[in-house]
């Protein structure tokens, strides 16, 4: 009797389309107004404040302060994750995290970082590149006190980026902390948790335009605290 060969078995199994969409034809035509050099603010932080206000009030964004933070380890291997921006001013852009997390360990070894704000509904994005430094403990504590009680407990319960046995282990750690620090009781600031301030050396503002001829204007830091503006080809 003739058996079924591996080739016959393989051919009998229907092959699913790995991509059920025609990605090559998926595109949008941007029709937003452009961005010119004459419209820019004197500093990138002022310009960011303008755009952020629009993103937060008129942009239709769920979390306008969500940004993609990209870091690299000492061997140059990159990693990215979404983090919430919690403060910005002329001194830089601030976010908070577990200092034992992958991103924090990579920033301690290699402080060069990129922040990407993907404001897709507005056909805009902002890319900040610079150097990250830890914030002071007083600044960290002041922000920690503004967090919801549950988020404060979560900062203790999660050993961020470590392997956890299962969800029950994580929930169990949280439950123990909730019993120790019930609602209304002050939760101490974890020593392994705090902020990073990204001091920018370049900030690019991207505005989508028709025919993929987008506007890309980049502020580049110069000596003495000044900035020059460059237009980049799209």
UniProtKB/Swiss-Prot annotation:
Transmembrane segments: none
One MF annotation (Gene Ontology) recorded for this entry: FMN binding
UniProt keyword annotation of Kinase present: no
Keyword Flavoprotein: yes
Cofactor note: Binds 1 FMN per subunit.
Leading EC class: oxidoreductase
Gene3D superfamilies: Electron Transport, Fmn-binding Protein, Chain A
Pathway the protein contributes to: Cofactor metabolism; pyridoxal 5'-phosphate salvage; pyridoxal 5'-phosphate from pyridoxamine 5'-phosphate: step 1/1; Cofactor metabolism; pyridoxal 5'-phosphate salvage; pyridoxal 5'-phosphate from pyridoxine 5'-phosphate: step 1/1
PROSITE patterns to which the protein is assigned, alphabetical: PYRIDOX_OXIDASE (PS01064)
EC number(s) on file: 1.4.3.5
Binding site for FMN: 81-86, 96-97, 102-103, 125, 160-161, 206, 216
Keyword vocabulary terms for this entry: Flavoprotein, FMN, Oxidoreductase, Pyridoxine biosynthesis
Annotated signal peptide: none
Catalytic activity: pyridoxamine 5'-phosphate + O2 + H2O = pyridoxal 5'-phosphate + H2O2 + NH4(+); pyridoxine 5'-phosphate + O2 = pyridoxal 5'-phosphate + H2O2
UniProt xrefs under InterPro entries: Pyridox_Oxase, Pyridox_Oxase_CS, Pyridox_Oxase_N, Pyridoxamine_oxidase_dimer_C, Split_barrel_FMN-bd
Family: Belongs to the pyridoxamine 5'-phosphate oxidase family.
Annotated function: Catalyzes the oxidation of either pyridoxine 5'-phosphate (PNP) or pyridoxamine 5'-phosphate (PMP) into pyridoxal 5'-phosphate (PLP).
Oligomer status and interactors: Homodimer.
Name under which the protein is recorded: Pyridoxine/pyridoxamine 5'-phosphate oxidase
